[in-house]
């Protein structure tokens, strides 16, 4: 059964489908952090038009965040998964095997990231929200001029879908 995570932001809600078969450890980390409320009230601290939006750092600086496995954990690079277009969900890192809690969502194809970042899902619903987030004006450090915040992120349970 697929795992989906609904992410409610100050700009709207989007749903992520996690690739649990291809990156089980990464998906478990993301889903567990979401259910614990770890991502609630965090900002998308880096937005680069036509490239990606990045969030998941509780410090909001791009230098923070930990995984459920400790500070960092290893990559789960799958050769069949590529950054082929907008809506690809990947782990942000500072080099090999430095995954924590930060993630990014692509706004366009980014093939130079293939093999360097763990792809662990995609935007299933709400790509318009992601595109609007990608248009937010930023400063010279790619920080949004207007705060874009995750209000709440949670795993979608089957009973939630029936309601």
UniProtKB/Swiss-Prot annotation:
GO terms for cellular component: catalytic step 2 spliceosome. Residues 1-155 form the PPIase cyclophilin-type domain. One of its GO terms (biological process) is mRNA splicing, via spliceosome. The keyword Oxidoreductase does not apply. It catalyses: [protein]-peptidylproline (omega=180) = [protein]-peptidylproline (omega=0). It is an enzyme of class 5 (isomerase). PANTHER family: PEPTIDYL-PROLYL CIS-TRANS ISOMERASE-RELATED, PEPTIDYLPROLYL ISOMERASE DOMAIN AND WD REPEAT-CONTAINING PROTEIN 1. PPIases accelerate the folding of proteins. It catalyzes the cis-trans isomerization of proline imidic peptide bonds in oligopeptides. This is Peptidyl-prolyl cis-trans isomerase-like 1. It comes from Neurospora crassa (strain ATCC 24698 / 74-OR23-1A / CBS 708.71 / DSM 1257 / FGSC 987).
């Amino acid at each position: 059964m697929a795992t989906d995570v609904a992410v409610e932001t100050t700009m709207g809600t989007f749903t992520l489908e996690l690739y649990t078969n291809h990156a089980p450890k990464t998906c478990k980390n993301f889903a567990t952090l979401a259910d614990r409320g770890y991502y609630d009230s965090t900002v998308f601290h880096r937005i680069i038009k036509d490239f990606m939006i990045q969030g998941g750092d509780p410090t909001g600086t791009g230098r923070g965040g930990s995984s459920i496995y400790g500070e960092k954990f290893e990559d789960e690079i799958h050769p069949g998964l590529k950054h082929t277009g907008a809506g690809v969900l990947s782990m942000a890192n500072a080099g090999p095997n430095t995954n924590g809690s930060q993630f990014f969502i692509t706004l366009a194809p980014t093939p130079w990231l293939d093999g360097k970042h763990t792809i662990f899902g995609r935007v299933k619903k709400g790509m318009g929200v992601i595109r609007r987030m990608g248009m937010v004006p930023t400063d010279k450090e790619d920080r949004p001029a207007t705060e874009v915040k995750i209000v709440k992120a949670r795993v979608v349970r089957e009973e939630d879908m029936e309601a």
